[in-house]
UniProtKB/Swiss-Prot annotation:
This is 5'-deoxynucleotidase PBPRA2627. It comes from Photobacterium profundum (strain SS9). Belongs to the 5DNU family. A divalent metal cation binds at H33, H68, D69, D137. Its main location: cytoplasm. The keyword Hydrolase applies. It holds the Pfam family YfbR-like. The record marks R18 as: Appears to be important in orienting the phosphate for catalysis. GO terms for molecular function: 5'-deoxynucleotidase activity; metal ion binding; nucleotide binding. Its cofactor is a divalent metal cation.
Length: 194
């Protein structure tokens, strides 16, 4: 039986720090971030289905959220201002991400690669599901900015402004519902939400 290093790599998600160029009050790794994205993506899918006549699979979308940054165990987390500095860099980095996805997929025993491809390979992911995960990813980054700003860390002020624009461009009724229903609580203290 051939040995697989797939899950040993995934276990290293907790070693990949997000926001590597930012001074953070509370550090965040991609494992923590991916779980939060899964929670939020699941909620967005439920909201879409229950409030806006959607027909999504919330559990599948939650899984996509869990796996959405797994390629970063091979690439690290590239800061957004660098990743999208210009179209050429963005295009080249996308190629690196795709290669990392394929490398991760190849680490699995062959009989499971087909099962994991729709979670790991961005070419195989349903585009409508991907949109929801990207919305959740942006929302979670925005929530991180709120957390840092509320802790007095102004390092995240520009990131918050940038993410507000991103949220506007990715806006959907379910995202607006989430923002209006859940986000204000992130500005409150533990006593205020208890």
């Amino acid at each position: 039986m051939e040995k697989s290093h797939f899950f040993a790599h995934l276990a290293r998600m907790n070693l990949i720090q997000r926001w590597p160029l930012m001074r953070s009050v509370s550090t965040e790794n991609i494992s923590e971030h991916s779980l939060q994205v899964a929670f939020v993506a699941h909620a967005l899918a439920l909201i879409k289905n229950k409030k806006f006549d959607g027909n999504t699979n919330p559990e599948r979308i939650a899984l996509l959220g869990m796996f959405h940054d797994t390629s970063e165990v091979l690439t690290g987390d590239m800061p957004t201002p660098i990743k999208y500095y210009n179209p050429a860099i963005a295009e080249e980095y996308k190629k690196i991400e795709l290669a990392a996805e394929q490398k991760l997929l190849s680490m699995l025993p062959e009989e499971f690669q087909e099962d994991y491809a729709p979670l790991l390979d961005s070419h195989c992911i349903n585009k409508d599901d991907y949109v929801i995960v990207k919305q959740a990813d942006s929302l979670c980054a925005y929530l991180k900015c709120l957390e840092e700003l509320n802790a007095g860390n102004h390092e995240f002020a520009q990131a918050k402004k940038r993410l507000e624009k991103t949220l506007q461009t990715r806006s959907t009724p379910e995202m607006e519902y989430f923002l209006n229903t859940f986000v204000e609580s992130f500005n409150l203290t533990l006593d205020e939400i208890s």
